[in-house]
Amino acid sequence: MSRKATIERVTKETQIKLSLEIDGTGEAKICTSVPFLDHMLDLFARHGLFNLQVDATGDIDIDFHHTVEDIGIVLGQALKEALGDKKGIRRYGQATVPMDETLASVAVDISGRPYLVYHVSLPKVKIGEFDVELVREFFQAVVNNLGANIHVNVMYGDNVHHIVEACFKAFARAVDQATQVDSRIQGVMSTKGKL
């Protein structure tokens, strides 16, 4: 079973092509014109062992908002498509990741019900030119388009780069765990018989 998807999204604001292979080796080829987002997506692929290719252009002369949000939309859609009927997946994943002085935890339930809990206090508003409020927008877009319940919690941290990086690494590891196929699971991991 090949769990792959390629999604293209073209609007007046962005042009995005994203290819994802869930059962990958962590290979990434990322070009979004948003360097900090490139770094986070590279981390997501590596720490989740997903193969990920993203080619994106957007109206970054205005700001990064549309590009970041739309990549979140497309990543959520790609995960959903690649998972298909979700038969045999563990459904739940959780990871806690330290990054120097920071500790971040992400829990994922690929339930079909989108809901984001985001308890992340960021000590400043920008990392270089990147508005850190866009991290929440990215996760919200993934949640809405994957149909998942995702809780992002930072227990403590001072360095904003470390905080965001720990969140993305924990997110990758939690999604990897939730998407793993377990041969003991018959159908889907739900008493309803459907996710």
From Swiss-Prot:
GO terms for biological process: L-histidine biosynthetic process. It comes from the Bacteria. It is an enzyme of class 4 (lyase). Keywords: Amino-acid biosynthesis, Cytoplasm, Histidine biosynthesis, Lyase. Pathway: Amino-acid biosynthesis; L-histidine biosynthesis; L-histidine from 5-phospho-alpha-D-ribose 1-diphosphate: step 6/9. One of its GO terms (cellular component) is cytoplasm. It catalyses: D-erythro-1-(imidazol-4-yl)glycerol 3-phosphate = 3-(imidazol-4-yl)-2-oxopropyl phosphate + H2O. InterPro entries: IGPD_sf (IPR038494), ImidazoleglycerolP_deHydtase (IPR000807), ImidazoleglycerP_deHydtase_CS (IPR020565), Ribosomal_Su5_D2-typ_SF (IPR020568). This is Imidazoleglycerol-phosphate dehydratase.
